[in-house]
Amino acid sequence: MIAFGLGAQTTRSVWDGVYSEDQAKRGSELYAKQCASCHGAELTGGESAPALVGDAFLSNWNGTTVGDLFERIRKSMPQDDPGKLSRQQNADILAFIFSANKFPVGKTDLDRETEVLKLIKFETK
């Protein structure tokens, strides 16, 4: 296993396999229970919630960090009870969203700490 120094981490992006397959599976189950009623089973959005897949989603978050998206989810979702999910649950849901957007899977779970997630750039190709 390669250990990344702080400098190396700053160059990571969502295209570098920042979540695991198992984490995305956990996130899929959580998403179905906590998010799908507003964002849709296929993550395509609804009347009161934006899509979490596709060009509009990607361009909306392009140029930010994974930490920015994580904090948005952590503080404002689920809409009927913001902040009720744990950091781990939010990270798992985010891994599922990344999987649905076809970002490459990695070998380790996406971190649940905002400071670490801010070192991962959200960018389109």
Give the positions of each predicted feature.
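Bacterial N-terminal signal peptides
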Residues: 1-5
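Electrostatic cytochrome c docking/interface patches
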Residues: 9-30
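Flexible coil segments in periplasmic/lumen-exposed cytochrome c-class electron-transfer proteins
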Residues: 12, 80-125
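The canonical Cys-X-X-Cys-His
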Residues: 27, 31-42, 93, 97
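Short cysteine/histidine-rich zinc-coordinating motifs and their immediately flanking basic loops
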Residues: 47-53
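Electron-transfer interface patches adjacent to heme c in soluble/periplasmic c-type cytochromes
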Residues: 53-68, 79-91
